């Protein structure tokens, strides 16, 4: 009987957990739909802006632009974008692992800009310099947040605190596929091949346009990374909670089968005892 009571307690416990994971899956699915729509809307704008910047950069000497001029990299910076919360499968762990690999391969001083509690809390316990940290981005990143982050990154780059800035985030492909990646932000990459700019007349000069456009370009690149990361987080959490719900169902079936077998054995033992008692009275 004690074994049966223990099985019933386990079944109730797993059922309670299953209700929670199912609810979290539904919440994550709702948030994912909105985040996915934001990513889909932002990608064409970011791609067109990158095309415009590339065409302008091809028309000027990159060394005249402070955000594109190359210099010796004495200290590299990595902007790690993780989540503020867990229960998202391997989402945070994969980003942290990629960051550790890059820091090991760097072979020169490096610093971290941590966006999200999970990455910040992990590297606080490691011998890694965290120059800035940003948390509470929310489920729907806003452009004003990206603008502030980009402004501080540009300032650190121009002041020489960082000689190179890279974004580490997860690119969103689908609810079941998100890929961690490293993407350079600063200095802004210049086209390898000169593009034909004969069809364009710039007023004012390309140099003047770029001085205004490049900071904006950094803002949009950071904003897109935040959107991609948030959609990936929701997708990873939805998948993780779906798997947890399925695993809970399997555990409930397993415990229920064990409970039924134990109950059947108990009933059989009672019948045997009754028959044995009846035989003894004859």
Curated annotation (Swiss-Prot):
GO terms for biological process: proton motive force-driven plasma membrane ATP synthesis. Produces ATP from ADP in the presence of a proton gradient across the membrane. The gamma chain is believed to be important in regulating ATPase activity and the flow of protons through the CF(0) complex. Keywords: ATP synthesis, Cell membrane, CF(1), Hydrogen ion transport, Ion transport, Membrane, Transport. This is ATP synthase gamma chain. One of its GO terms (cellular component) is plasma membrane. GO terms for molecular function: ATP binding; proton-transporting ATP synthase activity, rotational mechanism. F-type ATPases have 2 components, CF(1) - the catalytic core - and CF(0) - the membrane proton channel. CF(1) has five subunits: alpha(3), beta(3), gamma(1), delta(1), epsilon(1). CF(0) has three main subunits: a, b and c. In this bacterium the a and b subunits are transcribed but do not seem to be translated, thus the ATP synthase consists of the alpha, beta, gamma, delta, epsilon and c subunits. The lineage of its organism: Bacteria, Bacillati, Bacillota, Clostridia, Moorellales. The keyword Disulfide bond does not apply. It comes from Moorella thermoacetica (strain ATCC 39073 / JCM 9320). The keyword Transferase does not apply. Belongs to the ATPase gamma chain family. It is a peripheral membrane protein. Disulfide bonds: none annotated. It is found in: Cell membrane. InterPro entries: ATP_synth_F1_ATPase_gsu, ATP_synth_F1_gsu, ATP_synth_F1_gsu_CS.
